[in-house]
Structure formats: C-alpha cells, structure tokens
Design a protein with these regions (language model features):
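Acidic, metal-coordinating catalytic segment for phosphate/diphosphate chemistry
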Residues: 1-41
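Conserved Nudix-box catalytic region and its N-terminal flanking loop in Nudix hydrolases
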Residues: 42-84
Length: 170
C-alpha cells in the first residue's frame, strides 16, 4: 500500500560544490580638479558647475597618462568650464571617496583619490560649461555662498582651505 522510503545516505541538505566568492575588489582611480576664483570689485567669486548627478560641484577629472596633477586640474577647468587662462596658486588637499560607478564601469566599486588645486581666473573670465564633459550649468558664487553652493559635504575641508588662502591674499 505505502512505498517504503529509502534512507538518505547524506547528513543534511545537499550542497552544490561552489567555490568561495572572490573578495570584492575596488577599481582605483586618481582625479584632479580645481577651485577657481576671481577677484571682483565687490569681492571674490568662485566657479561652480552642475554635474552629471545634478549636484553643484567643482571641475575635476581623471589624470591622463604622463600628466601631472596640477596639469590635469587645469585641463579639466578648461574642458568643463571653458576657462583657459587660470593661474595655479596652491595645492588644497585630497579627498578619498568610494562609490558605485554608473557611467563607464556599470556598477563597479570605485575607490577614488581626488586632488584639488586653487586657481585664479582673470576678472573678465566667463564660464562656458560643456555638457559633453558633464558640466551642464556653471555660475560664479560669492565666497559667502560657496559652502551652500557645493553639494558634496566631503568638500568642506577643501573649501575652508581655499577660502583661508584667498583671505590671506595668496
């Protein structure tokens, strides 16, 4: 009437012979960027741009092979903001970020060092953002508005250093 079940020869659930998952590795990247200001009769103004994430930021980008950090920062200000006559003043520091790439590496974990430099532009410098370089809008903001204009909290120490240097007359 009832068929007898054969006893199992294993002790516990059957497991597939899967190798352990490899450790999660991050892609390392180095970028360089600039905080650009100009001295106006009514005070200092800094350039900010609307980036591909819809946030106000500063120009930055990957350092190309054979290129130094300051040269990369100057090139990025030219490509993203159209500023070709800027004067390098000072190294501002580095921020270290981790994120998931959504453009080139599609979800890859990225560990990026971003080096920032302080540049001075000519008084009559105009901003010409380039959407092809992920700079969708750009504007000059006063030093008082700079903290509110920057959308990224990790930029606070860099902004503080830039403002202190400009205040000292560098």
């Amino acid at each position: 009437m009832f068929k007898k079940k054969r006893p199992s020869r294993s002790f516990g659930p059957k497991l597939k012979n899967n190798p352990p998952a490899p450790p999660l590795r991050a892609v390392r990247e180095v970028s360089s960027g600039g905080l650009v200001f100009k001295r106006m009769p009514r005070g200092v103004q800094f350039a900010v741009m609307l980036d591909s994430y819809g946030k106000w930021a500063f120009p930055k980008g990957h350092v190309e092979l054979g290129e130094g950090l300051p040269e990369a920062a100057a090139r990025e200000t030219l490509e993203e903001l159209g500023l070709d006559q800027v004067r390098l003043l000072e190294y501002l520091g580095k921020i270290d970020i981790w994120f998931r790439d959504r453009f080139e590496k599609h979800g890859a974990l990225v560990h990026k060092d971003i080096h920032y430099f302080l540049f001075e532009a000519l008084v009559d410098a105009e901003l010409h953002p380039d959407p092809a370089e992920h700079a969708y809008e750009a504007k000059w903001v006063s030093s008082k508005q700079l903290f509110k204009a920057s959308s990224y909290p990790d930029m606070v120490p860099i902004i503080k250093r830039a403002l202190a240097l400009v205040e000292q007359g560098v």
